[in-house]
Amino acid sequence: FMRSAATVHVKQNGSIRDFYVKEALSYIEQNFQNDISIEDISASCGLNRSYFGKIFHDTIGRSPQEFLISYRMTKAAELLKITSLSIADIGNAVGYPNQLHFSRAFKNVYGISPRNWRNENKIE
């Protein structure tokens, strides 16, 4: 009964969904540099993965995985622009301990390698 009452409330005004999504965004912001999974994020909200994925996508417009990758790559781009940290160190700092995986993910998002992106965007 409690879950169905909550579901009715969500359909009426969305405030419970907003709460869960804000909790998830806060968790991502605080933990993106760690090896976190969508299960970890959904568990931090007290939800199962499939329900969490649906409300997150309905609210944000993309899957939790897409959002996490985008968030990490935005942070990586900031670090590439303003620091002289190595590509490996930046990958590590944004949750990619494997430099090859980081470089591939970065290139998927930006269409260019982290090294080339840095060369084109570095603040001197």
Feature-to-residue mapping (PLM):
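Alpha-helix N-cap/loop-to-helix boundary motif
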Residues: 13-16, 33, 37
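Pre-recognition alpha-helix immediately N-terminal to the DNA-recognition helix
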Residues: 19-27, 68, 74-78
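Basic/polar phosphate-binding segments, predominantly the helix-turn-helix DNA-binding elements
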Residues: 27-29, 35-71, 85, 91-116
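Sigma70-family region 2
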Residues: 4-9, 33, 57-58
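An amphipathic alpha-helical interaction segment
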Residues: 1-12, 16, 20-23, 47, ...
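Hydrophobic recognition helices of helix-based DNA-binding modules
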Residues: 1-5, 28, 56, 80
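Generic C-terminal helix-cap and adjacent flexible tail
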Residues: 119-124
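Hydrophobic/aromatic residues within well-ordered alpha-helical segments
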Residues: 1, 72-75, 83
